[in-house]
A protein has these predicted regions:
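Small/polar loops that bind or transfer phosphate-bearing groups
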Residues: 6, 31, 59
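A short, hydrophobic beta-strand/beta-hairpin element that forms part of a small beta-sheet core
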Residues: 47-56
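Local sequence-structure signature of Cys/Sec-based thiol-disulfide redox active-site neighborhoods
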Residues: 1-24
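Non-catalytic, surface beta->alpha helical segment in thiol-disulfide oxidoreductase systems
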Residues: 55-73
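Surface-exposed interaction regions that form or flank ligand-binding interfaces
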Residues: 43
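Short conserved loop adjoining the S-adenosyl-L-methionine
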Residues: 40
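Thiol-based oxidoreductase modules, predominantly thioredoxin-like and allied folds used
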Residues: 27-37
Length: 73
C-alpha cells in the first residue's frame, strides 16, 4: 500500500505538501477530505495529512526536514 495525501481544495498547505512530495519523487494518491464524511470527521482541521497503511505520518505544515525524518530519506 502506498502513500495517501488527504487534502482540501484551495488549501495552500496542501498545495505545498503536494509539491514537496513530488519534488522528492514520492508518489501518492489524493483524497479530498470534504468528499468523505469519515475523512472529514477525522482530518477536517488537520489537512494536509500524509498516511501510509492508514497511519498518520505527517500533518499540517510539511517541511523537507520533517518529511525526511518520517520517511528516512
Amino acid at each position: 500500500m502506498g502513500y495517501v495525501l488527504i487534502t482540501r481544495k484551495g488549501c495552500h498547505l496542501c498545495e505545498e505538501a503536494e509539491a514537496l512530495l513530488a519534488a522528492q519523487g514520492i508518489a501518492c494518491t489524493f483524497q479530498d477530505v470534504d468528499a468523505d464524511e469519515n475523512l472529514k470527521k477525522l482530518y477536517t482541521f488537520r489537512v494536509p495529512v500524509l498516511l501510509r497503511e492508514g497511519r498518520v505520518l505527517l500533518e499540517g505544515k510539511f517541511t523537507l526536514e520533517r518529511l525526511s525524518k518520517k520517511l528516512s530519506l
